[in-house]
């Protein structure tokens, strides 16, 4: 499995998941350009995918292989699987963990989702206000306003954190501009929970561009932010094991390319 991290490029987001996979399941995190000193973030999803594809081909030229992606990294993983498949590589499946459909990140979609969320929260706060003593209502409203007031971003002086911030910003800009084409492989969608099917993220739309799709979901209450953390990692590791059982086992022993980092167990 070759896995694209989220928008910040942190391959160790997969660490807890990998710890619950079988020891004979190869799993490599793909580190994007821009995190290492002297490297520059790539500015399009297509270029990011080409960068990873070149590294994978140097390591495992034809496959079989699985491609995975988490959150916004799912968009890059989709394009990576698409490019590899189009070039003749044996991509047995694409696994997307809590990956919103790429157009869900566009400004109008984001604002619409925020409006729906705030409308729901307004009802909740109105009910709360009715239960708060009159003498405390002004304080409650002031606290809510402080939370909603945007804060000025702090200046980042640490060069490592500054590079990560540039990768985050560049990746999100690229994802918002991406338009997916057809992908000739099977898709396994890992949803944080079943209700995510109907969320702002529209994750099942990825299936419109693949040859087949299977959908799996974690427990209700799980969110994309925590699905790969230790509390839920065993659940999703078991689902990965389930989908990988149908696939041919990959050979091991080749040298690792520079951009491919094995997630620590």
Predicted regions and their residues:
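A hydrolase-biased, glycine/serine/histidine/acidic-enriched motif that marks catalytic-domain neighborhoods
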Residues: 1-265
């Amino acid at each position: 499995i070759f896995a694209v991290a989220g928008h910040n490029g942190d391959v160790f987001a997969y660490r807890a998941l990998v710890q619950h996979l079988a020891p004979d399941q190869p799993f490599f995190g793909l580190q994007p350009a821009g995190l290492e000193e002297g490297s520059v973030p790539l500015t399009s999803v297509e270029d990011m995918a080409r960068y990873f594809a070149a590294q994978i081909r140097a390591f495992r030229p034809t496959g079989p292989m699985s491609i995975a992606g988490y959150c916004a990294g799912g968009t890059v993983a989709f394009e990576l699987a698409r490019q590899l498949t189009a070039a003749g590589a044996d991509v047995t499946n694409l696994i997307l963990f809590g990956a919103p459909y790429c157009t869900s990140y566009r400004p109008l979609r984001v604002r619409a989702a925020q409006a729906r969320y705030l409308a729901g929260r307004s009802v909740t706060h109105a009910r709360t206000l009715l239960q708060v003593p009159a003498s405390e209502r002004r304080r409650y409203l002031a606290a809510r306003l402080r939370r909603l007031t945007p804060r000025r971003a702090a200046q980042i002086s640490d060069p490592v954190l500054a590079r990560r911030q540039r990768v985050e910003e560049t990746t999100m800009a690229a994802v918002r501009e991406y338009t997916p084409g057809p992908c000739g492989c099977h898709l396994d969608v890992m949803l944080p929970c079943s209700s995510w099917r109907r969320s702002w993220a529209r994750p099942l739309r990825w299936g419109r561009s693949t040859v087949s799709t299977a959908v799996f979901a974690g427990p209700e209450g799980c969110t994309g932010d925590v699905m790969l953390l230790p509390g839920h990692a065993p659940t999703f590791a078991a689902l990965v094991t389930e989908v990988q059982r149908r696939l041919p086992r990959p050979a091991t022993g080749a040298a690792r390319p520079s951009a491919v980092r094995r997630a620590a167990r």
